[in-house]
Amino acid sequence: ARFPGKRAGILATRGTLSAGIYQQALDAQGAHWTVPDSEAQDALMEVIYDGVKAGQAPASYRSRFLSVLERMPQADYFILGCTELPLAVQALELDIPAVDPTEEIARTAIRFCGYPTLPRP
């Protein structure tokens, strides 16, 4: 575990949050988690759809993304539960404690196929 005993901030689309995928998995492990409040979720949806997916310059969504993180002070680390969010973090050159589920799935699939995985960047 990379963040034992820490509270996860789940960042994802409304649909993913409504499905409860990450919440259920964390609950099964007895882990604590939080999600954005309504205003922060609105801002996150704008970052995802009007920013990253729309191909906008990172500077155009920087303040919105940072406002989401700032509104989640109880989160010790973030689960980047939408494929656009790791791209945003990288483009904005943010150094935040985070888990990229897509990267974790890829690493697991590679190991499952019998290949060693490379160290984390």
Explain the meaning of each model-derived region.
Residues A1-P121:
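Non-catalytic structural scaffold of enzyme domains
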